[in-house]
């Protein structure tokens, strides 16, 4: 019984050692690489495992590249993996570029991949151009009519400008700017509706793909709709603004006229008060004249008759009310 127990416990470390050997020495992967024409030693696979590089990713990528006729080494692929790159995507991009006769080196592909771009998708766009639909672009012609335009931009990836080149957003912004400029330079919106291809020609002549990761192949106007009459709307707004300014100025003049009228009324009242004050001094002056003998009693009555006659005439003509003031006879001594 002791002998059997010792034999059963002996198989455990042997099994663990065998599994550990298979982990560090991927024999099956080495055999696959050997029969696929990839020359990689078993110790290289062990060192990859020690450096925490998955040997299967490196070996499968090497097999794919070798079968496609690419000249790459395990060191280059392993270095790109350690740098954080997507090794399978780079290999697929290199194969696609090679079959399409596109000049793309392993160094360029890894640089594009490490720059954050999908290098395989970039090669696909370079082979099969991509169509970008622009959002609605509103522009106003010289006659004030608004036009709402949609365009389709056909682009092809520029492999040489993928690192550091602007993306789709820049293309869309530049195309929109070109459409606005082209429509704005048209004398009438009818010209744009009659010849929408003129917009495409003018936009293409501006070289909008400079400094971008794409090459613009064509710009096609998909739809042109007539919007609002912006010119008439602006004229109405301007007329309303002018009307409000005129009303404000008229109100200002009216207020000034009212102020002047009130001022004149105040001056008139002041003058009338002065007249009344002066008239109140007349009886005193006449009394003094009578006392001093400068006028006689008959002169006084003659003046009273003239005054009564004047009041009567004014009452008849309606120009004023008769003077009902009762003046007492002066005390003649």
Swiss-Prot record:
NCBIfam families hit by this protein: PRK13665.1
Highest taxon listed in the record's lineage: Bacteria
Xref: InterPro entries: FloA (IPR022853)
Cellular-component GO terms for this entry: membrane raft; plasma membrane
Transmembrane segments: 11-31
Subunit field text: Homooligomerizes.
Listed Pfam families: FloA
Keywords: Cell membrane, Membrane, Transmembrane, Transmembrane helix
The family this protein is said to belong to: Belongs to the flotillin-like FloA family.
Protein name (database record): Flotillin-like protein FloA
Topology versus the membrane: Single-pass membrane protein
Major localization listed first in the record, in broad terms: membrane
Keyword flag Transmembrane helix: yes
Job of this protein: Found in functional membrane microdomains (FMM) that may be equivalent to eukaryotic membrane rafts. FMMs are highly dynamic and increase in number as cells age. Flotillins are thought to be important factors in membrane fluidity.
Gene behind this protein: floA
Places the protein is found: Cell membrane; Membrane raft
């Amino acid at each position: 019984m002791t002998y059997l127990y010792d034999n059963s416990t002996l198989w455990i470390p042997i099994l663990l050692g065998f599994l550990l050997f298979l982990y560090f020495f991927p024999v099956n992967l080495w055999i696959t690489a050997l029969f696929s024409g990839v020359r990689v030693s078993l110790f290289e696979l062990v060192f990859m495992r020690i450096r925490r590089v998955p040997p299967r990713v490196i070996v499968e990528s090497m097999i794919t590249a070798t079968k496609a006729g690419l000249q790459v080494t395990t060191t280059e692929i392993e270095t790109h993996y350690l740098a954080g790159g997507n090794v399978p995507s780079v290999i697929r991009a290199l194969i696609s570029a090679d079959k399409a006769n596109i000049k793309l080196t392993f160094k360029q592909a890894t640089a594009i991949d490490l720059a954050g771009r999908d290098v395989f998708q970039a090669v696909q766009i370079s082979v099969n151009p991509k169509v970008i639909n622009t959002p609605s672009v509103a522009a106003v012609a010289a006659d004030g009519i608004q036009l709402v335009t949609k365009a389709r931009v056909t682009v092809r990836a520029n492999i040489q400008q993928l690192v550091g080149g602007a993306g789709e957003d820049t293309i869309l912004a530049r195309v929109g700017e070109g459409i606005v400029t082209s429509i704005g330079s048209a004398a009438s919106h009818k010209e744009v509706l009659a010849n929408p291809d003129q917009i495409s020609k003018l936009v293409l002549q501006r070289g909008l793909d400079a400094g971008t990761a794409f090459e613009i192949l064509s710009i096609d106007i998909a739809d042109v709709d007539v919007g609002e009459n912006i010119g008439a709307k602006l004229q109405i707004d301007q007329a309303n603004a002018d009307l409000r300014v005129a009303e404000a100025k008229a109100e200002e003049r009216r207020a000034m006229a009212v102020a002047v009228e009130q001022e004149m009324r105040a001056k008139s009242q002041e003058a009338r008060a002065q007249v009344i004050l002066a008239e109140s001094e007349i009886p005193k002056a006449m009394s003094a004249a009578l006392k001093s003998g400068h006028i006689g009693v008959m002169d006084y009555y003659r003046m009273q008759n003239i005054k009564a006659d004047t009041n009567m005439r004014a009452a008849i003509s309606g120009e004023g009310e008769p003077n009902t003031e009762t003046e007492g006879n002066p005390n003649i001594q």
